[in-house]
Amino acid sequence: MSPPLDSSRPVVVIGAGIIGLTTVVCLLESQYYKQYHPPIHIIADYLPNDPLDAKYASTIAGAHHLSFADDGDGRQRNWDLKTFQVMYEQWRQFGEDSGLMALKQTELFVGQMDHLKIYEEHPNFMTLPASMLPPAIDHAVSFTSLTITPSVYLNRLLKQISSLSNGQVKLHRFHLPSLSFLSHPSIKALIGHEPTAGVIVCVGLGALVLGGVNDSLMYPTRGQVVKVRAPWVRSGYTRQIGSLNGGEGGERTYVIPRANGEIILGGTREEGDWYPYPREATTKDILRRAMEICPSLCPANLVAQPLSGTDDRSSTFSSNEQSPSYENPLDSLVIDSLVGFRPSRKGGIRLERGPDLDENTVVIYNYGHGGAGWQSSWGTAEEAVALFCKATRN
């Protein structure tokens, strides 16, 4: 049974990461919104301009569009391809102001002689001949892909939401303890007293503790990365040792340039690890691995002389001063080491209609993207909104 609708009944999206915000944009572009123009409210613990927090993975992500979709996983492939198409068009239209950068991406494989077929859907795909393979690499491909500067992209989404709604979408920082709390007076004071038409749950790891959801299949996959400044690197590299296994297998090393000259180096995949701070040994290991796959990260002058100087004699160290010493020449380029918790879920993304919250409120779930949130965001958002419109017969 579809709930009765009118233009005064609000729709609530819970979560303001990449999944929640793309879902709101798709909702604003839907036939449902065009017909009813309902109030839309975003309720979230974390917002895009907050200080970095491991539990808000969207701003700590690299990020790049690099699908993990297995060849036989048509649903994930479709989500990822849709997202690439949307983002590639945004880059074509707005350039790097979009927070996106198009670049040559090279995938290096150790211990396997094949690649995911979805890479062949990208522009300029090619398999590298054996004569071009770096030492110890068994297989490699390259293609055009995209990297994302998360803070820029998320803020553009906020502006897009404001533009599409004429400023009518309301963003609330509020810790929602349970879905049933949407009927509490403190929430009604924010979203109005009309019955809620629908709730789209985009809470990532919050699904573990959100009452009415309490999804025990959710778990963190800890990722540690190192942010460096190396604007001369404008190509992306990854090295996969062993089976990818849906995105969480083997050892993966990556170099993700951003349009602003920052580079994200990674990484780790530590399932069930809630430690929110960088581990020094991990930082050193990431720097070592990054140099192995992208030696151009560190120009020759840094290898010979850890701290760049000038020809001016006044800038050199006196006999009483010691020149800085680095274990890795990349140390002098490091901005920060960061940790984020990927919102992983046994069985994969939960994207479905759940039981109605009451006889009048549709509930749609869109969470559990693990490390694939950025690369599947638009595809899953579009499907979540389609499920909502179907539930309300729009």
Curated annotation (Swiss-Prot):
What cofactor does this one take?
FAD
Q: Which Gene3D superfamilies match?
A: D-Amino Acid Oxidase, subunit A, domain 2, NAD(P)-binding Rossmann-like Domain
Q: What is its EC number?
A: 1.4.3.1
- Sugar-modified residues: N214
List UniProt keywords, sorted A-Z.
FAD, Flavoprotein, Glycoprotein, Membrane, Oxidoreductase, Transmembrane, Transmembrane helix
Offer a single GO CC term for the protein.
cytoplasm
Q: Can you tell me which residues bind FAD?
A: I19, A57, S58, G62, R342, G373, Q375
Q: Which GO terms describe its biological process?
A: D-amino acid catabolic process
Write down the SUPFAM superfamilies for this protein, in alphabetical order: FAD-linked reductases, C-terminal domain, Nucleotide-binding domain
What induces this protein's gene, according to its Swiss-Prot or TrEMBL record?
Expression increases when grown on D-asparagine as nitrogen source.
Q: Which family does it belong to?
A: Belongs to the DAMOX/DASOX family.
Name used for this protein in its record: D-aspartate oxidase
Source species, please?
Cryptococcus neoformans var. grubii serotype A (strain H99 / ATCC 208821 / CBS 10515 / FGSC 9487) (Filobasidiella neoformans var. grubii)
